[in-house]
Amino acid sequence: GGGQAQEVLESAINYSVANGSVTIAASGNINNNMDFYPASYDQCIAVGAMSPCCERKQGVNSCDAEPGWGSTYGDQIDFVAPGVRIFATAKRAGYWTDFNGTSSACPHVAGIAGLMLSKNPYLNPETIRELLRQGADDIGDLGYDIETGYGKVNAYESILLVPSPVSGDINLDGTVNISDVVILVDEILFGSYITTGDINADGINNISDIMLLIQIILI
């Protein structure tokens, strides 16, 4: 990442999110209030690094013994996650290492998003962002702040908030009704594929899914 926005990258991210991908990016390790891309793009979930003392990782003022860097902050920050001496596997003796930075904080959030999707694969990116917000622990100034965003991500609380999928709820409004049938018919006629419309889980949207959906509504 860096301090310069790139239109082609932003367009790619917007396209990816519009098609259901969750985009999560590290805020950078410059220890200033500044834009850092791609984290500063609106469609990205921007993740900063937290020190072991549950505050934004700073430089010489940090509570840990890592004075050489700090987590970049600003109004683009959504969340913080642990970012100091995070363990990881490595192709070396012992097969492990540890590393610092917002690049070590970011995977925590990506992992939580993956767990949320494993509970309900029909969640869209904005719903995942909102449930992460609701589940986060507010560790900075009350409410949102530019140093820690909405707070420290909390896997347990965010996953608890994930609703179980409802078979046939194509528009994800919590109910199964004629609106879902209309959407499924439209998707089939225009030859596209929507995961929530694949009622029989055979990898395609077709008349069989419509028949099953109608049965669900009538039961």
Feature locations, PLM:
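Substrate-binding/access-modulating region of protease and related hydrolase catalytic domains
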Residues: G1-Q43, C53-C54, Y73, T89-P107, ...
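Alpha-helical segments with a strong preference for the paired helices of cellulosomal dockerin domains
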Residues: E7-S11, I170-Y193, D202-I219
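Residue-level detector of buried hydrophobic side-chain packing
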Residues: V47, F79, G101-S103, I112, ...
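Carbohydrate-associated surface elements
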Residues: M50
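A glycine-rich, coil/turn loop motif that links secondary-structure elements
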Residues: N100-T102, Y144-G151, D169-T175, G197-N205
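Alpha-helical metal-binding/catalytic segments enriched in His/Glu/Asp
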Residues: I112-N120
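Short, well-structured alpha-helical segments that form the helix of a local strand-helix-strand
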Residues: P125-D138
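Low-complexity, Pro/Thr/Ser/Gly/Ala-rich linker/spacer regions in secreted
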Residues: Y156-D169
